[in-house]
Amino acid sequence: MNAQEANFDGLVGPTHNYAGLSFGNVASLNNEKSAANPKAAAKQGLRKMKQLADLGFAQGVLPPQERPSLRLLRELGFSGKDADVIAKAAKQAPELLAAASSASAMWTANAATVSPSADTSDGRVHFTPANLCSKLHRAIEHEATRRTLSTLFADPTHFAVHEALTGTPALGDEGAANHTRFCAEYGKPGIEFFVYGRAEYRRGPEPKRFPARQTFEASRAVAHRHGLAEEATVYAQQDPDVIDAGVFHNDVISVGNRDTLFTHERAFVNKQAIYDTLTAALDARGARLNVIEVPDAAVSVNDAVTSYLFNSQLLSRADGSQVLVVPQECRENARVAAYLDQLAAGNGPIHDVLVFDLRESMKNGGGPACLRLRVVLNDAERAAVTSNVWINDTLFASLDAWIDKHYRDRLAPEDLADPALLDESRTALDELTQILRVGSLYDFQR
């Protein structure tokens, strides 16, 4: 059956800020306490969505989550009216207010892991929201993520939206940022590739400086609940040394699409065995794996982390050629820029490189790949998505005007204590649910 890969980007929320909450994420730590520009952040992401939609790629949008999370703050012991809760948290534990105010749900690569119907035992598209249990500000996302996905992908004939895995370190799950899929064509059965940082119940190498957020056990559990064939599921361990260098998710060091794996030579433990396993598995599905391995001598791990070369989108055009979507930081690094020029001029599958200004997201450690959740849909499944979430001229204009109306152009850490920010955010989100036709999605609407 004809199928297409759709990218659902997270719309940056009104509380976008730089609180330095993500240990292991170098950009997040380096930009802690800087002033952010939520309006610019939202517009940068929206412009990427629109340009890709204009090029013929299926492009959807996912709404922000409500922030600050009064639910979290009340759970942590702050009481009173909403304004009192915010004031008490700001005075007594500003780090908790920052966690409750994070707009990190914008990075929808961490929202869930998705398996298309061609791969699953029951022939439905399966979603497992990521528990993101390694970070407080992200661990509060999965319930709202499940609600959003259940709203957009509501037809049980076509879709299965699961609960997140239990939020324990043994089942640490960071979603699609540690998952990719290889196939001959999107609508045909493929190979699902899960990358983990450590295993809870068996000995193996682990990072020493920064935490490994994804466990083997979590990846395996997601594969089992999605009903994936064992012979079409491949697991790989990310090299712990690159985690210690700031590669906190695998999508910071590799990206895959169709029959192509674009990766750094230091991405994986026992890389040749992984390449061989993927090659054999994909060969059984009628395709030949094409590995584009970037040597450390050309682009170092530090170059990869600072430029986010691999936190790129690798997209297939209708003619089968592939385009790489990268942040502008890749052009500002001389070694990375030179490599990209060589790549595009070569005889490989990647013929074009598109460059986007995503500076606001990048300063928090999120490039093009972080901002999108890939969902392969056949024609019937796409028709079952009835909300107004597909980017076109009309929706782009509505969202652009909505951002202009509701977003601040400066948000410093001390501004999180402003109770007006909650009211502004709720007003904006209430209007957004009408634009996207998603009903009463938020707790404050119920």
From Swiss-Prot:
Binding site for substrate: 19-28, 110, 137-138, 213, 251, 364
Reactions listed under catalytic activity: N(2)-succinyl-L-arginine + 2 H2O + 2 H(+) = N(2)-succinyl-L-ornithine + 2 NH4(+) + CO2
Annotated GO biological process: arginine catabolic process to glutamate; arginine catabolic process to succinate
Keyword Hydrolase in record: yes
EC number: 3.5.3.23
InterPro entries: AstB_sf, SuccinylArg_d-Hdrlase_AstB
Pathways per UniProt: Amino-acid degradation; L-arginine degradation via AST pathway; L-glutamate and succinate from L-arginine: step 2/5
Signal peptide: none
Molecular function per GO: N-succinylarginine dihydrolase activity
Pfam families cross-referenced by the UniProt entry: AstB
Alphabetical keyword list: Arginine metabolism, Hydrolase
Active-site residues, record numbering mapped to chain: 174, 249, 370
Physiological role: Catalyzes the hydrolysis of N(2)-succinylarginine into N(2)-succinylornithine, ammonia and CO(2).
Recorded family membership: Belongs to the succinylarginine dihydrolase family.
PANTHER family on file: N-SUCCINYLARGININE DIHYDROLASE
Complexes and interactors: Homodimer.
Protein name: N-succinylarginine dihydrolase
Species assigned in the record: Burkholderia cenocepacia (strain HI2424)
